[in-house]
Amino acid sequence: KRGFLDVITHVGKAVGKAALNAVNEMVNQGEQ
């Protein structure tokens, strides 16, 4: 069962990183 939590944690981190990248892209485009 612990593996299931590991998968959720991994996916959560990946989604969070993707969201941060998207925000950074928007900020960079706004500055140009």
From Swiss-Prot:
Main location (coarse class): secreted
GO CC field: extracellular region
InterPro entries to which the protein is assigned, alphabetical: Dermaseptin_dom
Residues with Glutamine amide modification: 29
Record-level GO BP terms: defense response
Tissue: Expressed by the skin glands.
Positions of the pro-segment in this chain: 31-32
Subcellular locations according to the entry: Secreted
Keywords from the UniProt entry: Amidation, Amphibian defense peptide, Antimicrobial, Cleavage on pair of basic residues, Secreted
Pfam families recorded: DD_K
Function: Has antimicrobial activity.
Protein family (similarity comment): Belongs to the frog skin active peptide (FSAP) family. Cruzioseptin subfamily.
Protein's name in the database: Cruzioseptin-9
Species assigned in the record: Cruziohyla calcarifer
The organism's taxonomic lineage, starting at the top: Eukaryota, Metazoa, Chordata, Craniata, Vertebrata
Gene that encodes it: CZS-9
